[in-house]
Amino acid sequence: MYTSYGEKAVTIKDATGKELTENRIVYEFVDQAFLQAYVKAWKFYAQATEGSDPKKQYLIIEEINRGNCAQIFGDLFQLLDRNGRGFSDYYIHADNDLKRHIYQKFQDNGVTFSEYHQKAIDAVYPKEEESVALRVLSGEILLLPNNLYIWATMNTSDQSLFPIDSAFKRRWDWKYRPIVKGRDEDGKELKWRIAADTKEYDWWSFLEKI
């Protein structure tokens, strides 16, 4: 989800002092949509002043059921359960490579928690012996802050796509969005039409039929 690779030239010398060049594959993290949103959300959280709400960060997933959600989300699935304060109920541990990468991203973006923020986060997890806030900053664990919103769309009528199991479904709030007539910036109805052979049909009437 986060890695890609590229070639890097490594120069070495043999016993005669002659330079030898060897091409090696070097793996490195390349931030994708989730990690970008994750770092931004914590940055906004850390920037919020005491008593104010942090700026909201949104991660938009279009047509979520076009892929296998269990495979796509992996361990992140556990982060979707939120507690009463909007944080993840459960955190997950990052492996050493991801831990170092997240820590560096936080450093690069100036993400650090004030005493107020640290206490606020730790208060959400009173049973933890170590500071959860500091473990988040170190990259050791991942958990979603209360200003990170994940919104997804899906077409429930399309049976050709991947089914979503009930355990995944219950971790979301669902809202039905019906098809509505298109309108321009002034609110006037867009009278779209489609052509088939020599005839034209009203687009909205076509949608209602199917």
Q: Model features per residue range: what roles?
A:
Residues 1-210:
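C-terminal regulatory/interaction module of P-loop NTP-utilizing enzymes
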